[in-house]
Regions:
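N-terminal helix-cap/turn-to-beta initiation motif at the start of protein domains
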Residues: 25-39
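N-terminal glycine/threonine-rich, aromatic-flanked beta-hairpin/loop signature
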Residues: 46-91, 142-143
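N-terminal secretory signal peptides that target proteins for export/translocation
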Residues: 1-5
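Beta-sheet ligand-binding and adhesion/scaffold domains
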Residues: 26-30, 48, 91-150
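Bacterial N-terminal signal peptides
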Residues: 9-19
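Sec/Tat signal peptide C-region and signal peptidase I cleavage site
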Residues: 20-24
Length: 150
């Protein structure tokens, strides 16, 4: 082999190795690297409640699992993040099992330049969307930014 073909032959196995390593990351590693771990809210100064004060936290649990805790003030629930992958455009795609709802949902977050994140889609396993293209399907309003709380 000569010239560009030789370089290509050397580059392909290297690129395949990189691809395999990326896909071998755990849910916890992916969530941590993307910046998801921690509490998020529309307004971190408001106490948890059903309206503007819901706190959505993503935490690393035993066994290197990621749990999604929703604090609505009067009620708190916990669900397991069963898959996390980052798309080529930087979107974090999650699959979460909600035991109280008895359903698995898939949703995607985009990290904004100011460090907030927005939900770009949210759907059930039947492909029924509550959020599509960054807008609520019920009213067409854009999803709000969520702030990371300390």
């Amino acid at each position: 082999m000569k010239g560009p073909f030789r370089r290509l032959a050397l580059a392909v196995p290297f690129l395949l190795t990189l691809t395999l390593n990326v896909s071998a990351e755990t849910v916890a590693e992916t969530a941590r690297a993307w910046g998801l771990i921690g509490p998020w809210s529309l307004d971190c100064s408001v106490a948890p409640d059903r309206g503007e004060g819901a706190v959505l936290a993503y935490q690393i649990a035993s066994g290197d699992r990621v749990v999604h805790r929703r604090n609505f003030g009067a009620t708190i629930d916990e669900s397991e993040v069963i898959a996390a992958k980052v798309s080529g455009d930087g979107m974090l795609n999650l699959r979460v099992f909600f035991p109280k709802l008895k359903q698995t949902r898939e949703y995607g977050f985009a990290m904004q330049p100011d460090g907030t994140m927005r939900a770009l889609y949210n759907r059930n396993q039947k492909g029924e969307y509550t959020i599509r293209n960054g807008k609520f399907t019920a009213n067409g309003n854009p999803t709000p930014s969520q702030h990371k709380c300390n």
